[in-house]
Amino acid sequence: MVYQMQEQSDLKVEIIMKPIAVSAIAVGIWLISPVPVAAQDARETLNACLSERIETEAQLLDCVSAAIEPCLSEPDDMNAVAALCFREARSQLDAGISAGMSDLRASAYDEISTLVSIELKYDILSGLLQCDRMEELAVALSEYDAEAIQRQKAQCQATTSGLAYARLTLRGREN
């Protein structure tokens, strides 16, 4: 913080806060605000959507969007809370991916589980690479602040995990 003193009839102190202090305030607000309950149920929401007939990639994306909807509905001025919500949803979905791969390895032929594992790995890697690309472009060329960019990246990562989980779940049903 920078303190600037001005002499007048009464002493005035102007405090200019740096972005780090603003981030600290946002984190403090997050600490007293609960993560949206539905973010904790991202996997359940996605499973419910996937239990319906899914025929296209667009329908998969709709299911993933429904799973992370509580995070999407966070106001624009709550970027830190939204980013945390997306990270929690991603964590739930990543746990589902791990469990799904364990189930697949236990129930499918080695060739099938190896094929699905390789496809899944590259689905995730290509998605995360696009998230990094979008972040780098936003930092270099946009007027968004750091928190908004982190929110976008967290959303992208949660969507990547959601799509990977959805594809794995559907592949598991085929075998």
State the predicted function of each range.
Residues 14-24:
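Bacterial N-terminal signal peptides that target proteins for export
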Residues 33-34:
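N-terminal signal peptide c-region/cleavage motif recognized by signal peptidases
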Residues 38-175:
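N-terminal alpha-helical modules
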